[in-house]
Amino acid sequence: MIPPNASLVKYDNPVLVSRNTEKKTPRARALKTSPQQPTNAGPVPNPPPKGGSKLPPVESQKAQQTDEILNSILPPREWTESGQLWVQQVSSTPATRLDVVNLQEQLDMRLQQRQARETGICPVRRELYSQCFDELIRQVTIECAERGLLLLRVRDEIRMTIAAYQTLYESSVAFGMRKALQAEQGKSDMEKKITDLGQEKRELERQVNELKAKCEAIEKREAERRQVEEKKHAEEIQFLKRTNQQLKTQLEGIIAPNKK
């Protein structure tokens, strides 16, 4: 028989439930069961002697009511091994001062063994303290059912609040992850855009350099053409001046004899 994980909550001896059992009473001892050795979840009291005196009707009814309340607060643990169903009910034995001291020692020891963090969010620490609180509720419920039920409401409220905070935390983490992915995607897009703009800039610079080279070639060609034209025009002017001087000399030579 392999018991479930050890817990700080005090349980009775695990019992083997018959395979043909369809309905279980509030306490597993009322079934056709075979008691086994206790687990290491904590000190387990010795079972009451079979030949002992029976409880008065009022006490028996009160004990049954306490058992039902305990089962509603802390449901029995069930597991299957080799096709057999095992059930372990939470203990209804009142706690002594030694049990409380032992609970504290067990809590400290398991916190150290499982290396629970002392601060911050720690699932291990939360689990162990939840088990400790459940054991305290069990102890209080046996002494006063009303006080135990009130503590149950406190426990459920705390769990609901923690669950709400956990949901909020998970949604915040998911939101942060989405934003991080969006930022990463935006970063990739911006890097690609920067690369494209860099290539476009280099292409434009190449075109500018080509146009500058063309402009310089055109300016050089036009300067050379202008020099050729200026030289040609200067030669034409000199030719026209010489021609004009020759014509003037000829004209003067023609006019001078006529005056005589």
From Swiss-Prot:
**What is a single molecular function from GO for this protein?**
dynein heavy chain binding
Q: List cellular component terms (GO).
A: axoneme; ciliary base; dynein complex
- Share the record's PTM remark: May undergo some post-translational modifications that shift its mobility on SDS gels.
Q: What superkingdom heads the lineage?
A: Eukaryota
- KW Coiled coil (keyword) present: yes
Q: Which residues form a coiled coil?
A: 177-260
Q: Where is this region: Disordered?
A: 1-66
Pfam family, any one: Ax_dynein_light
Alphabetically sorted, this entry's keywords are: Coiled coil, Dynein, Motor protein
- Report the SS bond pairs: none
Q: Which family does it belong to?
A: Belongs to the inner dynein arm light chain family.
Per the entry, what this protein does is: May play a dynamic role in flagellar motility.
Record protein name field: 33 kDa inner dynein arm light chain, axonemal
Q: Give the organism the record lists.
A: Strongylocentrotus purpuratus (Purple sea urchin)
The taxonomy runs: Eukaryota, Metazoa, Echinodermata, Eleutherozoa, Echinozoa
